[in-house]
Amino acid sequence: KTTAPSVYPLAPVCGDTTGSSVTLGCLVKGYFPEPVTLTWNSGSLSSGVHTFPAVLQSDLYTLSSSVTVTSSTWPSQSITCNVAHPASSTKVDKKIEPRGPTIKPCPPCKCPAPNLLGGPSVFIFPPKIKDVLMISLSPIVTCVVVDVSEDDPDVQISWFVNNVEVHTAQTQTHREDYNSTLRVVSALPIQHQDWMSGKEFKCKVNNKDLPAPIERTISKPKGSVRAPQVYVLPPPEEEMTKKQVTLTCMVTDFMPEDIYVEWTNNGKTELNYKNTEPVLDSDGSYFMYSKLRVEKKNWVERNSYSCSVVHEGLHNHHTTKSFSRTPGLDLDDVCAEAQDGELDGLWTTITIFISLFLLSVCYSASVTLFKVKWIFSSVVELKQTISPDYRNMIGQGA
């Protein structure tokens, strides 16, 4: 149900301030749904502004913002909190007025910052997909509490698995230098099968600055499972003139989108690779690319590179595609081999032609010689046959 917000200006309680700066606040309470926009002086005042994340309580949101200005700026100049809630078409402008008469305060009086509702914010993060799907690794669910005041650093964090409290989490506190607040990180080791079976993990946080404990829950999303198709692609020929070349791993047709891709070189993990985020395809599945930059000489020397993919749809949740430079891919070598082959074929053709030519010449000469000899023999015989016998003719005449 749409509910318009109530807006409350927050001012220091001591009248005039003795310090060089003063912090003012604006509380936006009891609205639904999100979002609201909050600006100071219609956006012209942006320096020193800190807007806290919205907090959901009893199905209504509460948001607060503070702005720090110099004592000479306020209250001598007007400062207004501008709130807009599009869902309810609400716009509210609240001018920050001094509380009480502006009298000279007692010397010990020091104005505290307004007690803004919001305080710490809580976030929960799932385990890394590789840690969940590889039995040799340990998955961890993480709860992070930010913007914890140094004045109230005590944060109580409780963990529940399917609403059963567990006590195996490890919690550490870190100081944030950029805004002088504390960050509390609680890590809960979990069982692989608990996450894969869809159990619910809940982080419950309490602190003095919180009006009520904040709970955050997380579990494995439900949905269809489809194993990815993995393809590895060598560098394009146009890139072989450069010092570095690109190897590509294309992963397609997988569901859900949680996936882990890495590269190895002869069994050693490579670091110089980049993965795209999974992209939703038209059929509801996902695809992604991973590229690895390597030195060309390493590729030319035929080092073996592998693209490893971890996904719940795969057999044993893991597959690896390996490849290296294939012999004979060098264009110069291919051309040289082709040229040598063409020359060999040409010499063979020439040799056969010459042999056949010489054989033909020899055959023609032999046939011609035989014919000449036969004709000559025939002429001689014929001449002997028809020659007159002069001796008989002389004898008859006598």
UniProtKB/Swiss-Prot annotation:
Annotated Gene Ontology cellular component terms: immunoglobulin complex, circulating; multivesicular body; plasma membrane
GO MF annotation list: antigen binding
PROSITE patterns found in the cross-reference section: IG_LIKE (PS50835), IG_MHC (PS00290)
Glycan attachment residues as annotated in the record: 179
Domain of life from the UniProt record: Eukaryota
UniProt subcellular location: Cell membrane
Membrane topology: Single-pass membrane protein
This protein's record includes keyword Disulfide bond: yes
Disulfide bonds: 26-81, 143-203, 249-307
Residues in Ig-like domain copies: 5-97, 120-219, 228-324
Protein name as annotated: Immunoglobulin heavy constant gamma 2A
Organism: Mus musculus
